[in-house]
Amino acid sequence: MRKFLMGFLIFIFALHVQAQTINTLTKEEKAAGWKLLFDGKSTSGWHNFNKQTIGSAWKVNEGILFLDPRDPGRGDILTEKEYENFELMLEWKVDTCGNSGIIINVVESSKYKAGWNTGPEMQIIDNACHPDAKIFKHRAGNLYDLIASPDESVQPAREWNKVVISSNHGHLQFWLNDVKQVETMMFTPEWEALIQGSKFVAHPDFGKAQKGRILLQDHDNLVWFRNIKIREL
């Protein structure tokens, strides 16, 4: 039943993306508890990691939030609110040979240098060009450095991709362009084993937080986002 509902959710999301104005919610979405994380007009609701403001490199144009890597006011950005059990939807596209990511359960503290020190990441990357995409578990839609997907469903660079991330009492699922990429249970012995076999073993608090902020990563490349919405479960 859960798989059916998730598949139906993604189908509806795809229809809505085509039929409605970007960065808006339908009456049905509002009734179901969805909220916009990006209003299509400003960077309101976002701030740089461990800061209270957002840098000038994150800009809005024609309803799209994007990172301008030429602007010195850069850095990862996070939601103002923390989330625990949720479904997140958004669309992204990345520049040729570009790299970025969506990180959840991020803990802000002066003891951490970056959001990826604590939160697991859904990889955003140009699979066809970026050298990191040659590495197993580092391709678009993967749970970065932890779990690879057997099914590649990413669009070419500079084309839009649809994402659904579901995190519900430790049950984590990633969907990319209607194809499930990852399904795992966090906060289990198996989860800890994944961490121990990854680069994150050097960060003792990685993957431990059961709630946190949602982060859009600055990885030195041009990346665009739109239709960012969330529903708490």
Outline where the language-model segments fall.
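Bacterial Sec-dependent N-terminal signal peptides
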Residues: M1-T21
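Carbohydrate-interacting regions of secretory-pathway proteins
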Residues: Q20-L233
